[in-house]
């Protein structure tokens, strides 16, 4: 299992314009601090488990509107932001790992986690060995970082660029309105 942070302003660090130009305007939504966290996991047989999406704040109306069938959505306290903590990890284990990994897979499975302090040694799923990657080594060892997450982020960036190009709604400060959670979930 690995968490990825999806920033809602995926502004590129490169621009294209005439050489020597001192100011290049960039269209953005001024939402640099707005982000969601998605926990992804693949079973030992290569099957993708349901994603676990963390939004900050409350969202009871959002869940009623969307009714996502292939996704588990949780809302976190504002102080936590949309980061995984021990309680949310326990919910992930119960709602996704224990529910989706059948008994045959569990007897032979290990759960590989990055060395995240918020979940370290706090809770582990039933019938599963949990191993933590050494600190600062996940970019070399974590299978999800090396494959699935990179592809997911790349596809989201393409979607975001298309959305920004076609979105003409602006705020009173003349910024493009940021992508809402409904748009994000429907696309995902």
Segment roles from a protein language model:
Residues 1-188:
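RecA-like helicase/translocase P-loop NTPase motor core
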């Amino acid at each position: 299992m690995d968490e990825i942070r999806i920033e809602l302003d995926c502004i590129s660090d490169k621009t294209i314009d005439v050489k020597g130009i001192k100011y290049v305007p960039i269209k953005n939504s001024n939402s640099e601090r707005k982000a969601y966290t998605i926990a992804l996991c693949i079973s030992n047989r290569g099957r993708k488990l349901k994603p676990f999406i963390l939004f900050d704040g409350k969202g009871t109306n959002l869940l009623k509107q969307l009714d996502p069938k292939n996704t588990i959505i949780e809302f976190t306290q504002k102080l936590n932001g949309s980061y995984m903590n021990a309680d949310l990890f326990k919910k992930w284990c119960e709602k996704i790992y224990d529910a989706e990994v059948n008994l045959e897979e569990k007897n032979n499975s290990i759960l590989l986690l990055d060395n995240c302090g918020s979940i370290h040694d706090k809770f582990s799923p039933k019938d599963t060995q949990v191993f933590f990657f050494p600190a600062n080594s996940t970019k070399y060892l974590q299978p999800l970082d090396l494959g699935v997450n990179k592809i997911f982020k790349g596809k989201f960036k393409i979607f975001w660029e298309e959305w920004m190009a076609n979105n003409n709604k602006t705020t009173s400060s003349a910024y493009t309105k940021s992508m809402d959670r409904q748009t994000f979930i429907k696309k995902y």
